[in-house]
């Protein structure tokens, strides 16, 4: 195996590497020969790359994210077996933030990070600091030393990671998935900037209108000031005694009058002011964020008064504008060449789920949400192509059925596949209707407490406890699963995922949710990998959000590729030895609103 690292000119376009022009040095450590090699001229670099191409494996840190795309662009280099210690680190130590807090003198800015610098501190093999002052304009001797030290840290990190005996199945899956997601990041998601600007104008106008309406609902408050007016015998007011004297009066001709006041207009952006006004109207807060009452759309909807609903509307419109144009990661600010290149951490959550930033496309509102359809219409297909959205059918409940199989011999799975699972859940919990059953089961799966469960039927914590008790009595396998999983966490502080990954779990209360969320994440990662093998036509990945993908292709190939992804989901189930059969569905359209 060969460990390697490269240094190039300064990069600003990390999505497409359009400004990558030159590689100054590549350093490689050959394990078999126990030798470090550094090359800095084009001919020697090409010879080293040829040598590396014959190695059984090459390993580097974040090489799938940068080094390999750079080498492919500059030298056409690829390799069939790549090991990325960044990916390994994120999978094996997904909860490293917790242990970092316990490390003595560990830099705060590196807590929870998986960078080489962070690992240098953890392992005592410090990364060279030259890169912090390098301009990356030309090759320097210090740059070569810096590159070689990165290779040394990577090598030490790799062997440290392997001591944890990570699941080979997990590592294989995560590397393949990360390579596909890198393609997605490079592709970006086509974004209709002109339509976005029109939506921005609509939302801005709506916010002004709502704000005006709220000034009538919430008159300004009168606040007393520390200063007083000065008044003459005729009743004329002066801001200060000095002002009266300057107006021609003698000091004994004015006297101290009433205390000054000022109007404080209601500020709908102030959560404190919102809470004060609502409490004055009789609201009693139930949830707090620190010492302040929690104020959000869900809380305001629960209050349900005309005033609260108007505030809710204002917060919603402001949130949409924040996502669209005003926030630091607003879509219009990040759109380049009418594409948004969102970043994805392929193992950003402890469960193995992806996390998203710059921007967080997972937070684009659903079509059913206010202005959700208008937001999703902004994310489109490239000119001349169609967008295909595919997702797994009933994934959460099928994951539950898989884990229940041990205790119910597939009864819950059979109800999902052949019956009406929501009606079955309704009857088991003793709920009034099917919609309540849907809300109940998903709240239960996401770890909702008794009070939250009780609120589904407009009841109390006691009602929630009663519903769960009935549910457990009618479907005893669920109670057995919950008990077994919570006991496992109490004993081991962890669970084992579908692909053998270790899931660190700090709370037995959230254990079932963690197990099911991880199963769904692993299935969808495997499904994407299988889809890439099954696809018989060209396509471009644009989005991978929880249990759905969005990709574009020629219209005549859309059905074939949509079905290929559904087949990929089924194949993922077989590979992962999933007990409940999996399936998927797809939609074809011009934009994201039409495909999910």
List PLM regions with ranges:
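Short, contiguous acidic/charged loop-to-helix segments that flank catalytic cores in large enzymes
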Residues: 263, 327-335, 365-367, 389, ...
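Metal-dependent catalytic core segments for phosphate chemistry
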Residues: 16-22, 396-429, 499
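Short glycine-rich phosphate-binding loop at a beta-alpha junction
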Residues: 56-64, 391, 452, 550-552
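Conserved "right-hand" nucleotidyltransferase catalytic core of DNA-directed polymerases
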Residues: 2-7, 18-20, 25-27, 106, ...
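Short active-site loop/helix that positions an aromatic residue
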Residues: 64-76, 88-95, 274-282, 393-408, ...
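Polymerase palm active-site segment centered on the conserved acidic dipeptide of motif C
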Residues: 202-233, 471-483, 556-596
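Conserved catalytic core of nucleic-acid polymerases
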Residues: 305, 346-349, 427-544, 553-555, ...
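Active-site-proximal helix-loop-helix substrate-binding element of RNase H-like nuclease domains
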Residues: 21-24, 28-45, 56-162, 173, ...
């Amino acid at each position: 195996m060969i460990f390697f690292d490269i240094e190039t000119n300064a990069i600003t376009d990390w999505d497409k590497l359009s400004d990558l022009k030159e590689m100054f040095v590549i350093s490689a450590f050959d394990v078999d020969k126990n030798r470090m090699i550094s090359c800095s001229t084009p001919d020697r670099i090409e010879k080293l790359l040829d040598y590396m191409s014959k190695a059984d494996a090459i390993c580097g840190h974040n090489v799938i994210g940068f080094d390999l795309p750079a080498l492919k662009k500059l030298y056409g280099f690829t390799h069939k077996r790549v090991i990325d210690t960044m990916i390994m680190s994120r999978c094996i130590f997904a909860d490293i933030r917790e242990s970092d807090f316990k490390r003595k003198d560990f830099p705060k800015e590196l807590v929870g990070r998986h960078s080489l610098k962070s690992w240098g501190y953890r392992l005592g093999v410090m990364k060279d600091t030259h890169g912090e002052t390098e301009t990356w304009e030309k090759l320097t001797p210090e740059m070569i030393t810096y590159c070689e030290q990165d290779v040394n840290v990577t090598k030490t990190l790799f062997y440290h990671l392997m001591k944890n005996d990570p699941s080979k199945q997990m590592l294989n899956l995560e590397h393949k998935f990360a390579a596909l997601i890198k393609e997605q990041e490079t592709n970006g998601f086509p974004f209709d900037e002109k339509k976005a600007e029109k939506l921005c104008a609509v939302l801005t106008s709506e916010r002004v209108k709502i704000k005006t309406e709220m000034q009538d609902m919430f008159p300004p408050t009168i606040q007393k000031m520390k200063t007083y007016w000065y008044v003459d015998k005729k009743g004329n007011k002066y801001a200060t005694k000095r002002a009266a004297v300057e107006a021609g009066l003698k000091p004994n001709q004015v006297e101290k009058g009433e205390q000054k006041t000022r109007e404080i207009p209601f500020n709908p952006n102030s959560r404190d002011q919102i809470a004060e006004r609502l409490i004055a109207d009789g609201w009693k807060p139930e949830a707090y964020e620190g010492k302040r009452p929690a104020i959000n759309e869900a809380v305001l909807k629960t209050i349900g008064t005309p005033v609260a609903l108007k505030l809710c509307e204002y917060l919603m419109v402001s949130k949409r504008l924040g996502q669209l144009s005003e926030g630091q990661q607003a879509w219009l600010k990040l759109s380049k060449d009418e594409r948004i290149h969102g970043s994805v951490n392929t193992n950003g959550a402890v469960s193995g789920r992806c996390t998203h930033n710059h921007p967080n496309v997972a937070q684009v509102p659903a079509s059913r949400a206010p202005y959700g359809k208008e937001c999703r219409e902004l994310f489109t297909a490239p000119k001349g192509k169609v967008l295909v959205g595919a997702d797994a059918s009933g994934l959460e409940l099928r994951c539950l059925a898989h884990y229940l199989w041990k205790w119910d011999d597939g009864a819950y799975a059979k109800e999902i596949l052949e019956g009406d699972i929501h009606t079955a859940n309704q009857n088991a919990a003793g709920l009034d209707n099917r919609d309540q059953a849907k809300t109940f089961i998903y709240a239960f799966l996401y770890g909702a407490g008794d009070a939250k469960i009780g609120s589904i039927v407009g009841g109390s914590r006691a009602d929630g406890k009663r519903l769960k008790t009935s549910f457990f009595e009618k479907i005893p396998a669920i109670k057995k699963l919950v008990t077994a999983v919570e006991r496992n966490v109490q004993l081991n502080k962890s669970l084992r995922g579908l692909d053998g990954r270790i899931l660190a779990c700090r709370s037995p209360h959230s254990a079932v949710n963690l197990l099911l969320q991880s199963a769904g994440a692993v299935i969808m990662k495997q499904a994407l990998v299988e889809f890439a093998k099954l696809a018989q036509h060209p396509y471009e990945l644009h989005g991978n959000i929880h249990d759905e993908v969005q990709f574009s292709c020629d219209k005549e190939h859309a059905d074939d590729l949509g079905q290929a992804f559904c087949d990929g989901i089924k194949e993922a189930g077989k590979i992962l030895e999933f007990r409940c059969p999996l399936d998927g569905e797809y939609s074809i359209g011009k934009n994201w609103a039409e495909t999910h």
